[in-house]
Amino acid sequence: MKALMQILKWTLITMLAFTSFNLFISPEYKVERSIEINVPTYIVYEQVSDLHQWENWAVWWKKDSLMITNYTGEERGLGAKMFWTSDVVGDGHLEIIECSSQGMKTKLAWGNGSWHFEETENGTNVSWSMNGKMPFLMSFMTMFIEDIVAPDFEKGLTGLKALCESIPAKTID
């Protein structure tokens, strides 16, 4: 009985410490990465606003070639939705909730995403971000989210750059 009381005591102390620790951590997070892509904005927009194209550049399909992806809603742009199932990267969904040639906003199961396209002298500056708020007992995860998400964003943007720069630009007469 004494051993059981010790286990209960240390379990309670651990739970209180963990809960107290979460009181001092912001539950809000934001991860953002940018890249310069040497093509006109419309080429980047066409690749990002068409969710079917993501498997050509986003890192998650490279991590799991068996990932199952389904698309509903619009073909591209506002209202386009993507659902995925994967033993490696998990299950989730994404929906484009705002869309224009300057960027778009997405809704995910665990946060919000946004894209910003800014024309530059040499092409397009592309920014990709995700933000959200963790549940109280998961607040500690905000300390690690940058390390978890940022490398995937960087690899995805690098893949997007390679893909977009391989597409010939249309000439306007």
What positions do the PLM features span?
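N-terminal targeting or signal-anchor segments and their processing/structural boundaries
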Residues: 28, 34, 166-173
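Hydrophobic-ligand binding "helix-grip"
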Residues: 2-19, 23-24, 78, 83-125, ...
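Extracytoplasmic/periplasmic/luminal assembly and interaction segments
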Residues: 41, 51-101, 138
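Extracytoplasmic/periplasmic, Sec-exported soluble proteins
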Residues: 36, 46, 88, 145-152
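Beta-strand/loop substructures that line and gate deep hydrophobic ligand-binding cavities in soluble
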Residues: 107-155, 160-162, 171-173
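Amphipathic, soluble alpha-helical interaction motifs
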Residues: 57, 163-166
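Hydrophobic pocket/interface hotspot
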Residues: 43-54, 82, 96, 104-106, ...
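Hydrophobic ligand-binding cavity/cleft-lining segments
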Residues: 2, 6-68
